[in-house]
Amino acid sequence: MLKEEDKIFTNLHGQQSHDLKSSKKRGDWENTKALLDKGRDFIVEEVKKSGLRGRGGAGFSTGMKWSFMPKNLEKSCYLVVNADESEPGTCKDRDILRFEPHKLIEGCLLASFAIGANNCYIYIRGEFYNEASNIQRALDEAYKEGLIGKNSCGSGFDCNIYLHRGAGAYICGEETALLESLEGKKGMPRLKPPFPAGFGLYGCPTTINNVESIAVVPTILRRGASWFAGIGKPNNTGTKIFCISGHVNKPCNVEEAMGISLKELIEKYAGGVRGGWDNLKAIIPGGSSVPLLPKSLCEVDMDFDSLRTAGSGLGTGGIIVMDQSTDIIYAIARLSKFYMHESCGQCTPCREGTGWMWRVMMRLVKGNVTKSEIDELLNVTKAIEGHTICALGDAAAWPIQGLIRHFRSEIEARIKSYSVV
């Protein structure tokens, strides 16, 4: 369990003001110039040593990602913060944007300095109107105080941070589709290589990071890499914001140590499963794009490696709890409709496959399929998985794979009951 003094996001639930004065009282912008004076290599190495892995879902080493940026270039390079949070079941970045905007802005400054970027863009989901307003107010405060802009914090480093609002497309959460949108084009993923670190925004080297990944950086640098690395488990260090929703007594967002038990997380912070743990049916542990886990696997540790071993993934940390009253087949069919709607249509397997899967899933809800079609559906998900430019095809396939893997008997019972009728 995370100690109170180890929490990074002390205003996660908005009990205090999010303005600059209150943020400074909570420790934001404390000796930021001293951190910048330590140099770029120090910041990158410290983040590497901390073991911080991307909090947007991929789990790639943040410090390693920064080190890929070319050095001593004459042309511009950019930092882009992905605040296009659109994953069903996920609302962690939204609370950071609402209640801890200065943590994010200070993190943007430090990360921009570390990679040599004088310009940073925060790409925020279009529907996040109030959150965008809070960020813009915080940016205005930071500019007025000289914390960002020309000679940021008196360090001699110039850093401009811009807020860019998206238009509600889930696909723009994919880093290269986000760059396309930022350039004023249709948000469609790019082929890789070239990777953004070599050819990103406007053809310049670019690093794209998640909101939470950037917001924890100032605290890591102040308290030290060893402090952050001492929380959680080896290779899964630090704290993480988990979003707990669905059939629990008290849905909430909570910051906890990586590696905490899923059961402990739900019972300690969300008041337990509605009707008790025995009433649990399944949990989606990391946002809608990861396979669900049946009750028998729901005492797993919440970290990248443990969940991968269990056949799922940590993803965004969006925990969706489903009790015995859930029509699990319909729940996954509803997710299939989401991915069909959000496919950009660029890749044939995703464009055609997501629609086909949704249509079969809706027949499956009624039981109006043959048993052989279960395997046919599974084969189609595997044909889509890994055969698209971005991971949306995988995200559409994995929930269905998890359903068939763990609830095949329920699907077959549905088919049998339909045939009897």
From Swiss-Prot:
Function comment: NDH-1 shuttles electrons from NADH, via FMN and iron-sulfur (Fe-S) centers, to quinones in the respiratory chain. Couples the redox reaction to proton translocation (for every two electrons transferred, four hydrogen ions are translocated across the cytoplasmic membrane), and thus conserves the redox energy in a proton gradient.
GN (gene name): nuoF
Chain sites annotated for binding FMN: 166-213
General remark: Belongs to an operon consisting of at least secF-nuoF-lepB-rnc.
Pfam families, alphabetized: Complex1_51K (PF01512), NADH_4Fe-4S (PF10589), SLBB_2 (PF22461)
Binding locations of [4Fe-4S] cluster: 344, 347, 350, 390
Catalysed reactions, semicolon-separated: a quinone + NADH + 5 H(+)(in) = a quinol + NAD(+) + 4 H(+)(out)
Known cofactor(s): FMN; [4Fe-4S] cluster
E.C. designation(s): 7.1.1.-
Details of cofactor binding: Binds 1 FMN.
Superkingdom of this protein's organism: Bacteria
Record GO terms (molecular function): 4 iron, 4 sulfur cluster binding; FMN binding; metal ion binding; NAD binding; NADH dehydrogenase (ubiquinone) activity; quinone binding
NCBIfam families per UniProt: nuoF_fam (TIGR01959), PRK13596.1 (NF010120)
Keywords of the record: 4Fe-4S, Flavoprotein, FMN, Iron, Iron-sulfur, Metal-binding, NAD, Quinone, Translocase
Higher taxonomy: Bacteria, Pseudomonadati, Pseudomonadota, Alphaproteobacteria, Rickettsiales
Sequence positions that bind NAD(+): 54-63
Name of this protein: NADH-quinone oxidoreductase subunit F
